[in-house]
């Protein structure tokens, strides 16, 4: 049994690519039957790889997607995944390969192993920063100024930047 990793994705790109990605993912959500038999159902990541023309045997697919949405001008798709152990970068890179105009930002967390990762270092699309204090204490902040204030209070010295 794996530790489950929760990842939020924001795909940004031109309208044609974003709309096509969204329509394909939405068709999987709305389908009465899974493309391929699996233990996750219609939103299994292997179905997503398959509908995009890939081979689910070659790309990590142990998980599912949900919370699919698109912005009003069709340039941003958001979705979340639950996957085994960590963020599936090969899946993310495969989607970006299929849609050359698309870049996918992610933020992932697998608390069992203390894994936290993101490629949105400026918190432009996924504004949530995690600070861990000890083994069980975690705090989430929307921006670095809040993190600096928290750390300043903890150590008794003013912090204003990462330098």
Question: Residue spans of the language-model regions?
Answer:
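Intrinsic low-complexity, intrinsically disordered or marginally ordered coil/linker segments
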Residues: 1-163
